[in-house]
Regions:
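C-terminal segment of N-terminal export signals and the immediately downstream linker at the start
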Residues: 10-14, 30-64
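Residues marking the start of alpha-helices
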Residues: 7, 44, 106-108
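Post-signal-peptide N-terminal segment of Sec-exported extracytoplasmic proteins
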Residues: 66-72
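Short amphipathic alpha-helical segments enriched in leucine
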Residues: 21, 60-64, 98
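N-terminal secretory signal peptides
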Residues: 1-11
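Mature-region segments of soluble proteins
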Residues: 2, 55-58, 72-175
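N-terminal export leaders
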Residues: 11-37, 113, 134
Length: 175
């Protein structure tokens, strides 16, 4: 009796899962989706384009730079601009920002590799209403996130816990 063996294998579970993930990711990216560089967070946009949202996130990071604060928190801070009310102001502002970057020889603001060069571009338009709106709203949008407080060592408000007098008022050790 002769045994016939073949090396033909069907698709493995691993290959099936990899294929499904790739298809799912390509569908999501095509539908107003912004993902962080670490891919640990993602955001869906409705009224602004993913490119505009990515530019806003980079702009926020350049205005208030903190190396220990993840992009996710900057994304949350600018998420409010993804609305019908801000749509035209964001589009016009990003176009002006990209035009300023193109004047420096770059394709867009997002393609400027060095923070110092991006800051110069921002300084050139710091008197614009677009810049002032973004900068002003970032103060509360970024720093009012309780998750960010812990990154800066801020324990939050103390009124509900009896105030600061008996709770950490004298615990500083750097004086």
């Amino acid at each position: 009796m002769e045994t016939i063996t073949t090396n033909a294998r069907g698709i493995s579970r691993r290959d099936l899962l990899k294929g499904c993930v790739m298809v799912g990711a390509s569908l999501a990216v095509g539908s107003g989706f912004v993902a962080g560089s670490s891919a640990a967070w993602a955001m869906e946009t409705i009224h602004v384009t993913p490119s505009e949202m990515a530019t806003l996130i980079q702009m926020a990071r350049d205005i208030y730079p903190h190396n220990h604060v993840a992009d996710e928190y900057y994304a949350r801070a600018v998420k409010g601009y993804d609305s019908e009310d801000f749509k035209s102001q964001i589009a016009e502002g990003i176009n002006a920002l990209n035009a300023a970057a193109q004047g420096q020889g770059y394709a867009s603001y997002l393609t400027v590799p060095w923070e110092a060069d991006r800051v110069k571009i921002l300084q050139s338009m710091e008197d614009s209403s677009f810049f002032q709106t973004i900068r002003g709203n970032l103060i509360t949008g970024l720093y009012n996130q309780p998750e960010v407080w812990t990154l800066f060592g801020y324990e939050g408000e103390s009124y509900s816990k009896g105030g600061y007098i008996n709770r950490g008022f004298n615990d500083i050790n750097w004086i």
